[in-house]
Amino acid sequence: GSEMCIRDRKVVLMGMGEPSHNLRSVFSAVEHIVRYSGIGYKEVVISTVGDKRLFKALMESQIKPALAISLHSAMDEKRRSLLPRAAELTVKEILEFGAKYAEVGKYPIQYQWTLINGVNDGVDEIEALAPLWSRQAILNMIPVNAVEGSPYKRPSAEQIERIKEACRANGILLKFRDSAAQDVDGGCGQLRARALKRKPAIQPAQELKIER
C-alpha cells in the first residue's frame, strides 16, 4: 500500500509554564526539534510573558527561535493587573527587546493581545502602542471567549472594527483571529472542568460506612 508522510510545519511552545523558568530544557527542546524535524528555527515559536532572563539568553545563544510575547495592553499598570505574575518589565522595555531580537533573528516578533470588552479594547491602547511599535512586529489579536461566571466579555463587532481601523491608521500590522466552537465551550480558554452538583459515584473515604 501507499505511505503518506505528514511533515510538521510549525511547533509552538505554549501553555506549559513560563519558558524563562526552565531555560535549559526549553533551549534543548528547540534544538532537538530543529535537528530532527527538518524545520527551521523561525518555525519554532516560544511563547512568553516577557522575562529578562529569557531575553538575555536568546541574544547570547546560537539558537534563535521565533518569539510570541503576551502583551495585552500598552499601559504598564493595566498590563501588570492583567498579568500579575509577569516579570517587572515595562511595555517599552519589552518592545525595545522585541525590535532588537527581530533584527538579529531576521523575522518578526509576534505580540499576543486578548481583547476584553471595556478593559483593553479602546483606541487609546493603540495610540499608546504606536510610538513604540517596530516594523518587524505583528500584533495578534483575538477576542476573549466568554466563560460562565467570568466578568470578561468579547467587545462588540463595532468596537472590534474601531480597533482594526486604529491599527491601520497607526501602521501596526494586525492579524485578527477568531475562535471556533464557542457554542460548545470548545474555544480557547473555555476548556475546563465544572463542579458536579450531584453526589459522586465514588464517595470520599470518610463518608463510607464499613460494617465488620
Where are the model-predicted features located?
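Radical SAM enzyme core and accessory elements
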Residues: 169, 181-212
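Short, small-residue-biased leader/transition segments that mark boundaries at the very start
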Residues: 1-6
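Conserved AdoMet/S-adenosylmethionine-binding subsite of the radical SAM
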Residues: 7-170, 174
